[in-house]
Amino acid sequence: MKRRNADCSKLRRPLKRNRITEGIYGSTFLYLKFLVVWALVLLADFVLEFRFEYLWPFWLFIRSVYDSFRYQGLAFSVFFVCVAFTSDIICLLFIPVQWLFFAASTYVWVQYVWHTERGVCLPTVSLWILFVYIEAAIRFKDLKHFHVDLCRPFAAHCIGYPVVTLGFGFKSYVSYKMRLRKQKEVQKENEFYMQLLQQALPPEQQLIQRQEREAEEAAAAAAAAASKSIHDVDSPAVAQNGSAGGKKPSSNTLPELEYREKERGKNESKKQHNHNQNHHSSTSSSILPSVDNKAQEMEYMENHVNSKRLSSSDLLGSTENLLKDEHSSSSSSSTSSNSNKNYKNASGGGGGGGSSSPRGHGTANGSVPSSSGPSSSASSSSKGDRKQKYGGGKNSASHRDPVENCIPNNQLSKPEALVRLEQDVKKLKADLQASRQTEQDLRSQLGSLGTSERSIRSELGQLRQENELLQNKLHNAVQAKQKDKQTLGQLEKRLKAEQEARAAAEKLLAEEKKRKKLEEATAARAVALAAATRGECTESLRRRISELEAECKKLTLDIKVKEDQIRELELKVQELHKYKENEKDTEVLMSALSAMQDKTQHLENSLSAETRIKLDLFSALGDAKRQLEIAQGQILQKDQEIKDLKQKIAEVMAVMPSVVYSADTGSMTPVTPHYSSKFMDTSPSGLDPNASVYQPLKK
């Protein structure tokens, strides 16, 4: 295979098309397509008697439900369906039918044109006016040709579904605005804390950061300009969907240009950094007092921010001593562990101001619980260390921190005072880190206190519920006690009455016993007197007495037997009474049953009579209908004959002349024909024109 090299100079460039004519042709074709679709849908509506444009919002609703189920879950999709269904029901019930159909059709076509690529322009507005005019002038009044009951739910959905989407859109817009407001507030706080941190840095590092930032901005601007120019050169001129291309420049840059611009920015920043280091070595003697002033300003700003941010430190006054101890221990342990990290952040570019998050800034500037405690001690210790380093130059080399051994090569040319100031800044940062740790501890303690408070509140609620239950039980017990007291009073009254009755019965029994004793005494006296008088008859009397006693025993036994028989008879009598009562009830029921049977028989007889009467009436009605049909047929025949006669009369009148003149031309008197209206009888008729059936007059 031979390789064929193409001649690049002979390549043909694509022909440039006129964008204006292309846009006009595309737009006209688009609007013609709209008109054709609209006409076809209206034709289908008229032919099939159904409004097919109402199916488009239903299809949009199904798509939105599917998307919500796919991306937001089943719960949100069910909630969305319920809200849309409720809105549809409200529109279906409270909007009149004609206005509902008008609003639904108008919304569908306006929304269909609104979803195009053109937006609001003169052709779309003209189409909207056309659609609204057709709907209001023609289709608003003509609802007879459509299935109203079938189309009405879809029309209600065409109004209810956009209302629901508008509500969700308004909610998302409000949430978006609130989120932007919150972002702006957080951005302002972050800028404030970044400004504080940048002002706390030495001025030479501020200058270095400012120059690096300007270099990065210049490099980014150059890269954006280059990418924009390349995009303008290589942008396609072919329009899609009737719109001219190349109007929206893309912000994507080429990777080669990005790499070159980044390398150029890095080289410029390195050159400026070396120049600033040389300039710093010559002007370090004049910067030292300004650095001291900046350190004092940084301490003042930190104290001000601590006093501003920690207004809640009064709530933790009882634990202040404990927090001071924790702060001192954590500061002593964290200075050695975080010194290397803080040193790297300080030497890398701005003292860690660019790498820390906004939340980190917030905790760093508002973490000390008492604004006059650890922060003031840290500032005083840093000042004392600074004085010792400035005053004692002999012992400074032997008592240096281990961090000084990690000084990079680009800072060897700096004076020792500046290095010591940087170490002081590192110590301050370590103190800030310790204060952050203490703040985290305090927050954890606050969280634990909050959880304990919640648990105590829940326990308090449970105790309140138990107290309410106990109060209810106590109330019920008091009510039961009162009822028991009332029943006890009633029982005591009954007991007193029974005791009184018992005392009366005992009195009667004692009186009867006394009477019996008196009778027995009198009988004994009489017997003694008789025995005394009749001593001879004692034996016979004794026999008689024994016989009488035997008879008395027999009589008592007979009395007991009779009493048992009487009891049995009483039981039988009671049973007979019950049986008689039952018989009376059965007699009443039988009488009621017989009365009901008589009533039912009477009702059946009356019902049969009514059915006979109804049958007679129906037969009479059928006869009357048949006679009426016969009479109507005769009337129709007569009407047909009258029409034929009228037609014949019209033909005769059309053939014969209307006026007949005599032979005398001088007089020329018109002769009235015999078929003229003058010969008609104008006397009023006695017939009723509104009568359904002809009735002859009675003479």
Curated annotation (Swiss-Prot):
Single GO biological process annotation from the record: chemotaxis
Ranges annotated as biased composition (Low complexity)? 329-346, 366-382
Please classify the protein's predominant subcellular localization into one broad category. Answer: nucleus
**Where does the record place the region Disordered?**
219-289, 322-411, 432-451, 679-699
Cellular component GO terms, alphabetically? axon; nuclear membrane; rough endoplasmic reticulum membrane
Composition bias of kind Basic and acidic residues appears in 257-271
One GO MF annotation is:
microtubule binding
Instruction: Provide the transmembrane region boundaries.
Output: 28-48, 75-95, 120-140, 154-174
For this UniProt record, the keywords arranged alphabetically read as follows: Cell projection, Endoplasmic reticulum, Glycoprotein, Membrane, Nucleus, Transmembrane, Transmembrane helix
A Pfam family matched in the record: Macoilin
InterPro entries from the xrefs? Answer: Macoilin
Glycosylation sites noted in the Swiss-Prot or TrEMBL record: 241, 267, 345, 365, 690
Bilayer topology: Multi-pass membrane protein
Q: Where found, per UniProt?
A: Nucleus membrane; Cell projection, Axon; Rough endoplasmic reticulum membrane
Family note: Belongs to the macoilin family.
- Give the matching PANTHER family: MACOILIN, MACOILIN-2 ISOFORM X1
Its job: May play a role in the regulation of neuronal activity.
Q: What is this protein called?
A: Macoilin-2
User: Gene name on record?
Assistant: maco1b
